[in-house]
Structures are given as structure tokens and as C-alpha cells.
UniProtKB/Swiss-Prot annotation:
UniProt entry keywords in alphabetical sequence: ATP synthesis, Cell inner membrane, Cell membrane, CF(1), Hydrogen ion transport, Ion transport, Membrane, Transport
Pfam families in alphabetical order: ATP-synt_DE, ATP-synt_DE_N
Biological function: Produces ATP from ADP in the presence of a proton gradient across the membrane.
Keyword Acyltransferase: no
Transmembrane segments: none
Record SUPFAM superfamilies: Epsilon subunit of F1F0-ATP synthase C-terminal domain, Epsilon subunit of F1F0-ATP synthase N-terminal domain
Localization, UniProt: Cell inner membrane
UniProt protein name: ATP synthase epsilon chain
Membrane topology, record value: Peripheral membrane protein
CC annotations in GO: plasma membrane; proton-transporting ATP synthase complex
Amino acid sequence: MSTIRCDIVSAEQEIFRGEATLVVATGELGELGIAPKHAPLITRLKPGKVVVTTASGEQLDFAISGGILEVQPQVVTVLVDTAIRAQDIDEAAVRKAKEEAERLLANRGDTVDVEQAQRQLAEATVQLQALERLRRTLKH
């Protein structure tokens, strides 16, 4: 089975590097599935998840805060502000961040940065979804 190298990196660190048979991410215009021999492409990514199917068939879930996806003939590069693997998510901290963002949005005042609160809510929601998907996978 053919593969494509996948690199997921942030400004601070390399988060993942490996061979993949499929990389799925959410671009500005919707879901993208990148397989080996995909046409070159560059697009912005929405906060959401990136799912990498490795050469061994394992699916790895990453929750991202948004970024850029670049596809070249031999490599997919995902440049992100932040990314976290589903199994590394601190559920209690994420739930607290989500509740705080929801509270800020519900009680909007002059000092509330609505865009920041919406971004925080989106990131927390994505992380909780990634965690739930990991739990479902482990049950099977």
C-alpha cells in the first residue's frame, strides 16, 4: 500500500511525523481527505481535528486550533498554532475552559473579547470530541 509522509508541527515542536495512508482535516471549505499522490494544495484549516491513518492502519486523532495544510507530492505538512493528541487531553481542564467560554459568551459585556471566547469554545469542543472518539475506539 502506498503512503505519504505526514508532518504535524507547531512553532514549539514537532507533534507527529510518520507515514500515512490517509490524512483527514477540516479546511475552510469543508473536509479534506489527503491520500498518496494527491494534487498539490495549500489551504487554511479551521479549528477541529486531524485524523491520520498510519501505514499500519492505526488512526491517530489530533485536536488543532487551526492552521495551514500543505500537500506536496511526497509529504503532507500540517502547520498549527497548537495541537494535542486525543489521549493527552486533560478532560477536566478542557471542560472548565469550555464552561468559561460559554459563560463569557452568555454574559457579553464591553470587556469580553467575543472572537477569543468563540475560539476557546471551538477548541474545547473539538478536544472533547476527539476524546470521545478515542473512548469509542478503545471500547471496540
